[in-house]
């Protein structure tokens, strides 16, 4: 009877230990997945480094600046790679960035552009719309980068 109690206690201890290990593994896996999906946190540094390597998306900035100089009343035609100055180079810079950093990179570039050009009101809304759709013009994922409302940039 004493042997049976010892065996039962040992099995119970193994069962509890096994459950604790499985729980810890699940929690660790969940945290790692959240970090991979979230471009903020430690991945934000990676995005900044990629922006540096891609010269702060300078060709995208030049492309958007050129777009702002055109009349907003012109009949817009679909833009494709190879048809617009700086668009090809912008697409190449975005292509060399990780997919999870592309939208954040465009937001960083747009903040800088806003400061340089002192954009506000309708101009800011216009450049935001163009930046939101830049990845689809480059045929890259994600196809669209929401930039938030105009008030988010004030």
UniProtKB/Swiss-Prot annotation:
Belongs to the 2S seed storage albumins family. The keyword Disulfide bond applies. This is 2S sulfur-rich seed storage protein 2. This is a 2S seed storage protein. The keyword DNA damage does not apply. Gene3D superfamilies: Plant lipid-transfer and hydrophobic proteins. Residues 72-76, 151-154 form a propeptide. Residues 37-52 have a biased composition (Basic and acidic residues). Coiled coil: none annotated. Residues 1-22 form the signal peptide. Residues 29-52 are annotated as: Disordered. Keywords: Disulfide bond, Seed storage protein, Signal, Storage protein. Disulfide bonds join 47-101, 60-90, 91-138, 103-145. GO terms for molecular function: nutrient reservoir activity. The mature protein consists of a small and a large chain linked by disulfide bonds.
